[in-house]
Regions:
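Metal-dependent enolase-superfamily TIM-barrel catalytic cores that perform enediolate-based chemistry
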Residues: 1-64
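Shared catalytic-loop signature of beta/alpha-barrel
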Residues: 50-65, 72-174
Length: 199
């Protein structure tokens, strides 16, 4: 009921708002179906149920666009997931999917509209998301990349002007990050090992 009230409040405050909800695969088909029948018009629901089979059943019951996120992102091989009749839109998050090239290849493979979104990264990761988004000739849905404000501190500024962001070259500023030198080295080494594996 709280979630339905929140949606109603957003709709009341801004009737033009595009409303998206993200469930992270936590609903059963019945829960999703009942909620979506009551919530009114939304742009889409992201990963309402966990499995492809559940998503397929839900899609046959409701007239709401369904986005697949975890169903691909957490798969050992997202190219082998059969999305036929299960979702309408693919969620692309650069880092969890293995980089810009792989995310783009995944979109081409599944031949569905995409939403390019962040996985709550710093400005560096969001810049990669912007680069992926810019590589598509056309996007049917707005990107979900305006998440930098959710971080207490960021390594660079990526301003949003009139609802738009620009791909930006910048030198990251790590001074404001609250982390120990040991932890910073651990992350740096992990990134270097990962980069080596991807070569």
């Amino acid at each position: 009921e709280e979630d339905l009230a929140r949606i109603a409040t957003v709709r009341k405050l801004n009737p033009e708002a595009k409303i998206r909800i993200d469930v992270n695969g936590l609903w059963s088909v019945d829960q999703a179906s009942k909620f979506l029948e009551r919530c009114g018009e939304i742009e889409y629901v992201e990963q309402p149920c966990a499995s492809v089979e559940e998503l397929r059943e839900l899609k046959s019951r409701v007239d709401v666009k369904i986005v697949g996120d975890e169903i691909l992102r957490k798969s050992t091989n997202p190219f082998e997931v059969d999305l036929q009749g299960a979702i309408d839109i693919v969620m692309l998050k650069v880092q969890p999917l293995g980089g810009i090239k792989r995310a783009h290849a995944l979109a081409a493979h599944h031949k569905l509209p995409v939403v390019v979104s962040s996985a709550l990264e710093s400005a560096i990761g969001i810049n990669y998301g912007l680069t992926l988004a810019a590589s598509f000739q056309e996007l049917s849905f707005d990107c979900g990349l305006a998440t930098g404000s959710l971080l207490a501190r960021n390594v660079a500024e990526l301003p949003i002007v009139d609802g738009k962001m620009q791909i930006t070259r910048f030198e990251p500023n790590f001074d404001g990050l609250e982390t120990s030198a040991d932890r910073f080295e651990w992350w740096k080494n992990r990134i270097m090992r990962t980069a080596e594996l991807l070569r």
